[in-house]
């Protein structure tokens, strides 16, 4: 008996898909008002369709060179470069083996401190960018000038908007502060904390803070954040 299973769908590879019409924020608010919904109605519905565990970007192995394994995230717009020291991985002290590239320099992530102190914000830069790098929001065609006149990117979650602002402006600048205020009331989409920890390689640094995943980053923290991009 022949199997009844057939490949009924032919998937087109490398097909550029535009997600919805590009409309300014006021147009979505008027649409929501006309059907008796909240102003952020469409943003919420659209962003809920981004399944983190299926559509989110992942960490991929690149190469092994001079005692290091090099990895990078699969997203093209927000590509993070990470490496780990194979010599340290083979030892008990594997927690300090991971590094990420920031402004052309390698910084250690996942450090375990043996003496008491205030280490709360030591890893904020990595986890801030890591959350955005994993998110499946399409971060192309970002234009600060259009954003300032009200053409909000409705298909970006609040974390990705904050990330684009940090990437394109200087820390503690008036321009960044103004843009962050514009994005202050944008819809925040929760990303499960396990998503930050789910990678294809063992002994990856453990995310210890819910900031950016279940709790949005504050305006002050984004204003002071250093971008990893040159």
Swiss-Prot record:
What keywords would UniProt list here?
Answer: Host cytoplasm, Virion
**Pfam families according to UniProt:** Lenti_VIF_2
Q: Does the keyword Acetylation apply?
A: no
Gene Ontology cellular-component terms listed:
host cell cytoplasm; virion component
Major location (coarse): host cell
Say if the entry is tagged with keyword Repeat: no
Compartment annotation = Host cytoplasm; Virion
InterPro entries assigned: Lenti_VIF_2
- What is the top-level taxon of the source organism? Viruses
What family does the entry list?
Belongs to the ovine/caprine lentivirus group Vif protein family.
Name of the molecule in the record: Virion infectivity factor
């Amino acid at each position: 008996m022949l199997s009844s299973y057939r490949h009924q769908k032919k998937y087109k590879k490398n097909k550029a898909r535009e997600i919805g019409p590009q409309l300014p924020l006021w147009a979505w608010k008027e649409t929501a008002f006309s059907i008796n919904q909240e102003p952020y109605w469409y943003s919420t519905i659209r962003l809920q369709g981004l399944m983190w565990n299926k559509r989110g970007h992942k960490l991929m192995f690149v190469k092994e060179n001079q005692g290091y394994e090099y990895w990078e995230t699969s997203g093209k717009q927000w590509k993070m470069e990470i490496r780990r020291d194979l010599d340290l991985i083979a030892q008990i002290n594997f927690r300090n083996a991971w590094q990420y590239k920031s402004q052309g320099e390698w910084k250690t992530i996942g450090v375990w401190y043996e003496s008491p102190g205030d280490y709360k914000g030591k890893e904020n830069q990595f986890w801030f960018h890591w959350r955005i790098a994993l998110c499946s929001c399409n971060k192309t065609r970002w234009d600060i000038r259009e954003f300032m006149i009200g053409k909000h990117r409705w298909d970006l979650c609040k974390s990705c908007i904050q990330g684009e602002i940090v990437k394109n402006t200087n820390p503690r600048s008036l321009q960044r502060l103004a843009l962050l205020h514009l994005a202050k009331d944008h819809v925040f989409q929760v990303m499960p904390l396990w998503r930050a920890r789910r990678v294809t390689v063992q002994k990856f640094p453990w995310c210890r803070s819910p900031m950016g995943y279940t709790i949005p980053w504050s305006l002050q923290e984004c204003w002071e954040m250093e971008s990893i991009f040159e």
